[in-house]
């Protein structure tokens, strides 16, 4: 890929489609939305309004990190935790979850756009998002989960033809910090799709803590992605007392573009340490398993 040519064309496309108007951009802090934000900022300057929505479904410390990196671009920070938990109450179907989240994201963006007199939405959709949504594998919140009715004049997706490894190339070319350019993929719906079943504040806090432990313990492994997911409940024993606790699945894979993936081989002692830390540091977890399923037949994320 000719990265320089891509950047030049992406900036040109954004300018041509937004013209003299204003645009808001959905910023999550991931490499896709971060690259999109830098490209759009180069194209529009202060006519771009970056919006970060704190859904309550982010990893530990993520909202604070976003403020630190993008605060100088006029970042609009929206605390929508209560809205998201209310909207997800009672929802157990993964497709419905993604649609609920996609719908709420867009309605929040519409509110911000109205306040700033912006008519365009820019988002960091990449090619695998489109393939999986169109193929019926899973609806990505910014594609299949995107509502059919919205108030924007146009939705612009400059990265729609790129794979993740190509987006990383662009990030490096643009000089984004390594913590962004090499950041592990994180789903747009956040920790909601790392919880099988209904999403509750308690489950989110558990999976957030478990995710942090997994990332810490596997920091020295070469991987595409690693994370923890809450997948159900099982009987356990803590302090000679029976407990009915949560099951945490650990997932760690290698991949080039996310379309296929293989589980990485983790040293047994490391896996045991992860299990002991998660069950020891998180009261309501009774069991930890390591998922060794490749993609296909599994997807990388659980929902």
UniProtKB/Swiss-Prot annotation:
Top EC class, one word: ligase
PROSITE patterns recorded: GMPS_ATP_PPASE
- Quote the InterPro entries the UniProt record gives: GMP_synth_C, GMP_synthase_B, GMPS_ATP_PPase_dom, NAD/GMP_synthase, Rossmann-like_a/b/a_fold
Annotated GMPS ATP-PPase domain ranges read 1-183
Q: Which SUPFAM superfamilies match?
A: Adenine nucleotide alpha hydrolases-like (SSF52402), GMP synthetase C-terminal dimerisation domain (SSF54810)
Q: Quote the pathway field.
A: Purine metabolism; GMP biosynthesis; GMP from XMP (L-Gln route): step 1/1
Q: Which residues bind ATP?
A: 28-34
Q: Which UniProt keywords apply?
A: ATP-binding, GMP biosynthesis, Ligase, Nucleotide-binding, Purine biosynthesis
* Residue runs in coiled coils: none
Give an example GO cellular component term for this record.
cytosol
Q: Which reaction does it catalyse?
A: XMP + L-glutamine + ATP + H2O = GMP + L-glutamate + AMP + diphosphate + 2 H(+)
Function of the protein:
Catalyzes the synthesis of GMP from XMP.
Protein known as: GMP synthase [glutamine-hydrolyzing] subunit B
Source species of the chain: Archaeoglobus fulgidus (strain ATCC 49558 / DSM 4304 / JCM 9628 / NBRC 100126 / VC-16)
């Amino acid at each position: 890929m000719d990265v320089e040519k891509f950047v030049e064309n992406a900036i040109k496309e954004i300018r041509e489609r937004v013209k003299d108007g204003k645009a808001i951009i959905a910023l999550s802090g991931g490499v896709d939305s971060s690259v999109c934000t830098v490209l759009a900022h180069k194209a529009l300057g202060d006519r771009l309004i970056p919006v970060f929505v704190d859904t309550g479904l982010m990893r530990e410390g993520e909202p604070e990190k976003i403020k630190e990196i993008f605060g100088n671009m006029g970042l609009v920070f929206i605390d929508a935790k209560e809205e998201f938990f209310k909207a997800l109450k009672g929802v157990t179907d993964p497709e419905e979850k993604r649609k609920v989240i996609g719908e709420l994201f867009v309605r929040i963006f519409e509110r911000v756009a109205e306040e700033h007199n912006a008519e365009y939405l820019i988002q960091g959709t990449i090619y695998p998002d489109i393939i999986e949504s169109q193929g019926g594998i899973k609806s990505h919140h910014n594609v299949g989960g995107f509502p059919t009715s919205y108030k924007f004049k146009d939705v612009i997706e400059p990265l729609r033809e790129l794979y993740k490894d190509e987006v990383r190339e662009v990030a490096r070319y643009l000089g984004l910090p390594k913590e962004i350019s090499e950041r592990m993929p994180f789903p747009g719906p956040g920790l909601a799709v790392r919880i099988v079943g209904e999403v509750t504040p308690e489950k989110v806090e558990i999976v957030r803590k478990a995710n942090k432990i997994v990332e810490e313990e596997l920091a020295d492994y070469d991987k595409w992605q690693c994370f923890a997911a809450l997948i159900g409940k099982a009987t356990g024993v803590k302090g000679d007392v029976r407990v009915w606790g949560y099951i945490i699945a650990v997932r760690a894979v290698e991949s080039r573009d996310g379309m296929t993936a293989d589980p990485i081989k983790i040293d047994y002692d490391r896996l045991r340490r992860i299990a002991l830390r998660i069950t020891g540091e998180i009261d309501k977890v009774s069991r930890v398993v390591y998922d060794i399923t490749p993609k296909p037949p599994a997807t990388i994320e659980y929902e």
